Amino acid sequence: DSFIPIFEKNGFITKIDFTVLDQVLTYLRDAMDNGEEAVPISVNFSRSHNETPDFVEQILSRLQKKKIPPKYIEAEITESIFMLDLTALTHNLHKLKESGISISIDDFGSGYSSLNVLANVEADVIKLDRKFLSYAGEDSKAPIFVKYLIRMMKRMGYQVLAEGVETKEQLTLLHNAECDMVQGYYYAKPMPIPAFREFLKEFNK
C-alpha cells in the first residue's frame, strides 16, 4: 500500500501491471500446453490505466499473442477508480466485457465509493474489503450488515467474493450469508507458481 501511490504518481505502475499480466499469460499458456487445468486468474490494474486510450487494446493484443481465451482473465480494479472520469471508465469496462474478459471491483467498502455507483457499473464480481470481516468479529450488528449487503449485491446480479477469510468462524458467517466465493489465508497464502500447481491438483482431488 505504501509504494503503489508512488508508482502511480511516476507512471511506473502501468509497466508493473502489464508485467504481471504477461507472467500470468505465460503460466496459462504453459499449463494449457502441458494438459494441466487452466483456471481464470485475476490481474489487478491500477486506476492510472483509465487515462491510457489503448488500455484495452494492449490487454487483448497480449492475449492474442499467447493465444489465451479472454475468459481466463479477470480484470480487477479497485473501487478508488470511481473517483476518476467515469465516462472513460465506463467505456473501458464496456470494451473489456465485450471482449469476454470478466471484471471485478476489488476492496469494495474501503472508503472511496458509495453503493449507488454499483447501479451503473459493468462488473461481474464485487470483492468485499477484509474490513467487513474484522468488524464482524467485534460488533454484533456487523454480521447482519454483511448478510444483507451480500444479498443486495446478488440481487443486483453481481457475484460476491469476501476477502481476508482467516478463520472457520468467518467462513461459517459467509456461508450462512450465501456469499459466492471467499479468499484468504484460511485456504492458502500467496505462493510461487510450482506450489500453486501442486495446490490446484490437491484442491481438485
Where are these regions (language model features)?
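Catalytic-core regions built around general acid/base machinery
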Residues: 59-62, 91-99, 148
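EAL-family c-di-GMP phosphodiesterase catalytic domain
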Residues: 44-53, 72-87, 99-205
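Catalytic core of bacterial c-di-GMP phosphodiesterases, primarily the EAL and HD-GYP domains
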Residues: 10-88, 164
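Residue-level signal for well-ordered alpha-helical positions
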Residues: 9-10, 139
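Conserved, function-defining core regions and hallmark residues within catalytic/recognition domains
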Residues: 3
